[in-house]
UniProtKB/Swiss-Prot annotation:
It is found in: Cytoplasm. Its EC number is 3.1.3.5. It catalyses: a ribonucleoside 5'-phosphate + H2O = a ribonucleoside + phosphate. Keywords: Cytoplasm, Hydrolase, Metal-binding, Nucleotide-binding. This is 5'-nucleotidase SurE. Its cofactor is a divalent metal cation. A divalent metal cation binds at residues 8-9, 39, 91. InterPro entries: SurE, SurE-like_Pase/nucleotidase, SurE-like_sf. It comes from the Bacteria. Nucleotidase that shows phosphatase activity on nucleoside 5'-monophosphates. Gene3D superfamilies: Survival protein SurE-like phosphatase/nucleotidase.
Amino acid sequence: MKILISNDDGYQAPGIVQLAQSLTQEHEIIVVAPSENKSASSSSLTFDNPLRPIQISNNVYKIDATPSDCVHLALCGFLNEKIDLVVTGINFGANLGDDVIYSGTVAGAIEGRFLGLPSVAISLASWKGQHFETAGIIAKQLINQISHTQLSHDTVLNVNVPDVSLNYIKGFQTTRLGKRHMSEQSVADKDDPTLYWIGENGKEADNGVGTDFHAIANYYVSVTPLQIDLTKYNEIDTVSKWLNQIK
């Protein structure tokens, strides 16, 4: 397969380097990734400035842009090549539960889906970042499986890999997104109290059996199929009744 690779940690990050190394043996890869860290950029696109791809090597390009920018540009004319699959990652840190709303890694995969391609987002579920090689092997296994049994074009898989040696991985689990509590309070800068730092992610609120949190805690690779439709269908009738009461 011809695979477009991107991420939100930047084109030189260890995760994307490992991902490219893991997939290049059996697939044709092209890397189009941000020139620097763009974590938590979600699905933002750049409309107020033109974007300049810079070729680093034969199949690697960097852009001063978000992950969604990179995928969008690559698939909408810049590469002028037929791509079969979009893979983003390997992210440094988990993308579990509500994290997916903010994640540039997941957003890059979603952009691929918007543009008609099956897409996979892969994250190493730890801030230690010790076992990217494990995640690379898992990525290779998943992508090889996809190459034999194609995913539908509107599929996004959110994959989280425990940050452990491969021999500790118990297998794969298909999961749903868990949930976090509200984020921690913002923190004033120690040197300048007029500046604030965004607080840490909230603790796990829904981490029961079947969630991505539970899979990772028990050394399983979590694979969550994502959908783009954010409509809360079970509230449509309630909201309709509420609207009908407006005078």
